[in-house]
From Swiss-Prot:
Active site residues of this protein: E187
Binding site for 3-methyl-2-oxobutanoate: D51, S52, D90, K118
Major localisation: cytoplasm
Subunit description: Homodecamer; pentamer of dimers.
Protein name, per record: 3-methyl-2-oxobutanoate hydroxymethyltransferase
Database matches in NCBIfam families: panB (TIGR00222), PRK00311.1 (NF001452)
Catalytic activity: 3-methyl-2-oxobutanoate + (6R)-5,10-methylene-5,6,7,8-tetrahydrofolate + H2O = 2-dehydropantoate + (6S)-5,6,7,8-tetrahydrofolate
Cofactor note: Binds 1 Mg(2+) ion per subunit.
InterPro entries, per the entry: Pantoate_hydroxy_MeTrfase, Pyrv/PenolPyrv_kinase-like_dom, Pyrv_kinase-like_dom_sf
BP GO annotations: pantothenate biosynthetic process
E.C. numbers: 2.1.2.11
Function: Catalyzes the reversible reaction in which hydroxymethyl group from 5,10-methylenetetrahydrofolate is transferred onto alpha-ketoisovalerate to form ketopantoate.
Length: 272
C-alpha cells in the first residue's frame, strides 16, 4: 500500500514547504513518456531527465557524449507523460561552459517541458547559476561526485571525505544557495557530511549515495529495477524489483521507503 497522498502538481514553493515540514522528497530518473507515466502515478515527486541516459540508454561509458539535442528530445518525451511531478533536467557536458551558452540550452529545455535545470559543479558554475536565476529559471546545483568531471576525478569516487574536502564541499553548497539554487543534489558524499549540509542549507537537499539525512532521495530508474547497464553497480543502489512484482510496484516500494526513512539504510550509505 502506498503512503503517497499528494495529487497536486509539484512546484518550487512546494519544495520549500516540504523542507519546512520535514516531508521527504522522492525523485527518480525517466527518459521516455511510458516510464514517466508510471513514476508520475506512483508517488514520485520529482522526475529527473538525467544525462545518465548516455550510459543507461545510449550505451556510452560516461555521460560526456550526451548533447543538448539528446536532452531536448528525451525531455519532450518525458513531459508528455507527466501531470503532477516536477520535471528537472540536466544541462549536458559543456552546455554550461558560459552563462550565455547555458541560457540558450536551458531555454530550449524549458520550451519542451523542463521546470528546473540541473547544473553540475561549483566554482565558475556559480556565475551560471546566478545568470539563470536572474532570468527566472529555477536551478538545481549538483555537488559531490559530478559525473561530467569523471576525467578529473579519475573515476567515480566518493567525494568530501576528510576535514579539508568536507569543508570545501560545505562551502560549495553555501555558495550555490547564495547564487540562487533552489535545490541541492548531493552524490556519493559521506552521510555525516550530507546531513550537515542539509541542516545548514535553506533549500532542500536530494541525496544519491549521501545517506538518509538528506531531504529527499534520487536513483536512476534502471538501477532501481535491477537492469544491467554494463557498468559496476554502486553501493547506494538497491534493486526494488528483485523479489518480483511490477515496475509500478517497485516504484511505490521505493517511494514508501524514502518517505518512511527505511531507504537508504547503512548498507547503501557511505561513511567518512
Amino acid at each position: 500500500m502506498s503512503i503517497y497522498t499528494n495529487s497536486k502538481p509539484w512546484t518550487v514553493p512546494a519544495l520549500a514547504e516540504a523542507k519546512r515540514n520535514g516531508s521527504k522528497i522522492v525523485m527518480l530518473t525517466a527518459y521516455d513518456a511510458g516510464f514517466a507515466r508510471i513514476l508520475d502515478a506512483n508517488g514520485v515527486d520529482l522526475i529527473l531527465v538525467g544525462d545518465s541516459l548516455g550510459m543507461v540508454v545510449q550505451g556510452h561509458d560516461s555521460t560526456l557524449p550526451v548533447s543538448v539535442h539528446d536532452m531536448v528530445y528525451h525531455t519532450a518525451c518525458v513531459a508528455r507523460g507527466v501531470r503532477h511531478a516536477m520535471l528537472v533536467v540536466d544541462l549536458p557536458f559543456q552546455a554550461d561552459a558560459s552563462p550565455e551558452r547555458a541560457l540558450e540550452a536551458a531555454t530550449a529545455l524549458l520550451r519542451v517541458g523542463a521546470q528546473m535545470i540541473k547544473i553540475e559543479g561549483a566554482g565558475h558554475k556559480l556565475e551560471v547559476i546566478s545568470y539563470l536565476v536572474e532570468r527566472e529559471i529555477p536551478v538545481c546545483s549538483h555537488l559531490g561526485l559530478t559525473p561530467q568531471s569523471v576525467l578529473r576525478f579519475g573515476g567515480y569516487k566518493v567525494q568530501g571525505r576528510g576535514e579539508e574536502a568536507g569543508g570545501r564541499l560545505r562551502a560549495e553548497a553555501r555558495a550555490a544557495v547564495e547564487a540562487g539554487a533552489t535545490l541541492l543534489l548531493l552524490e556519493c558524499v559521506p552521510s555525516q557530511l550530507a546531513a550537515q549540509i542539509t541542516t545548514d542549507a535553506s533549500v532542500p537537499t536530494i541525496g544519491i549515495g549521501a545517506g538518509a539525512g538528506c531531504d529527499g532521495q534520487v536513483l536512476v530508474l534502471h538501477d532501481l529495477l535491477g537492469l544491467d547497464s554494463g557498468h559496476p553497480r554502486p553501493k547506494f543502489v538497491k534493486d526494488f524489483l528483485a523479489h518480483g512484482g511490477s515496475v509500478a510496484g517497485a516504484v511505490r516500494a521505493y517511494a514508501n521507503a524514502v518517505r518512511d526513512g527505511s531507504f537508504p539504510d547503512v548498507e547503501h550509505t557511505y561513511t567518512s
